[in-house]
Amino acid sequence: MHLTQENNLNVDARLLNIENLSISTQDQPLLEGLNLHLQAGDTLAIVGESGSGKTISCLAMMGLLPEKLKTSGRIIIDSKNILEIDEKTQTHIRGCQIAMIFQEPSTALNPLHRVEKIVGENFILQGGSKAKAQQQVIQLLKDVGIANPEYILKRYPHELSGGQKQRVMIAAALVLQPKILIADEPTTALDVILQTQILELLKSLQSKYGMALILISHDLNLVRRYADKLIVLHKGQVVEQGQLQQIFKNPASIYTQQLLEHDLGFAEQRSTSHKILSVQQLNVKYPIRRGFFNRIQGYTNAVENVNFELAQGEALGIVGESGSGKSSLALALVRLIKSEGQINFLGQDINRLEQKALRKIRSDLQIVFQDPFGSLNPRMTVGQIVAEGLKVKAIADKEIKQQVESALIKVELAEGFQHRYPHELSGGQRQRVALARALVVQPKLLILDEPTSALDRTTQKAMIQLLRRLQQTEHLSYIFISHDLNVVKALCHKVMVLRHAKVVEYQPTEQLFNA
């Protein structure tokens, strides 16, 4: 059965009408006086930095706000006020009238369920048969651009790439053919090529199903090609609202002008220093296992014949699309995965070190992972997380406390943050905690895997300024993995471009960007 929708929609009918929506905690406003309306075919972009009220406004539209929050105003969908109806009616409206693609598919997709159940679950809950559900899921997977959907049906989320996970999320949201689709940061951690593919896909699906589309983003320049209406939020207040092209031509607020200014400049020049890392003929291969006994049938190359050098205080940017080998290279450098070739760090070949010597050298070589929410233990306070690396050393508790405080100060977090848990922090604050955890052991080289991908432009600028300052004061070297060329240009002295596991470009940053 092919999913279609009649195109004889009444263009004057409002699918969504929000009147003076305000949301607050007991003592703090989160959103103040939001007004908007949407018709079929409209694309609205809601843009702002972390904590501006973007996501919470859309959770309100979905009827998913925590009960402890105070709300006022009206959200009218299908002639009903979402803020006043009972849970049963809300459940019916969710999926049938309005659906949402959440920001991080890795956490939003149930790791214990196969794709077939994830996508088809709502269809079955609405009374559909399993046979029809499977047909619909296969068609939806085709519609969202997944090749070989019959094979993907049986896969678990961890077996999918980032782009595939995002497409599965979109399919799950579309299964009941909603009239309004909300996409919360749908391209945050994706490379530039995948970003374009996902946004083009959303627009084509909008046209096919006659939906209204709400794009939530921290990147004003990213949504320019895809939205016709724009709301800019700052600290819970609407600072700009209207037709997108008009706002781009003549932004009224200073805040919007700052968001539009996306050139972060070039990396600061450094004095020539001694070499601390030399990589020669580095290769990473993953086994391909098939058959009943899961035997190795061959190997796929993740990193192929990579060579480069890094000096003290120098920053190397590694860029490439998803699957190009960036993260595999980073994991190989700290020997978290097996590799072949020579990794000469501070005069020692990491691939030849015994475990005891490897543990010792890891204090000088630290990695900050892409998703701080996933890499920070939710049961530990910030102080405990940062102190973890010091526990293996013979250091007194008093000195550990002092070093933790010093590390937090370096990343511009106040002492009071020690007692908070990861879920109590913003995205930028969590990234600073992950950075402090690496800095507390006083490394000479930091490997940063997409550290700014989930951050808004303002927080990105602050993070880049912080990394620049740390590079000067701590004499750090960086290997900076990213898909954002503006960020790489701002921080790195050299750039390496990977494609299909191979180096296709390796030269000084200014030379590459001025070519």
Regions found by a protein language model. Give the residues of each.
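Conserved ABC transporter NBD signature motif
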Residues: 70-81, 341-349
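Conserved ABC ATPase "signature" region
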Residues: 132-151, 398-416
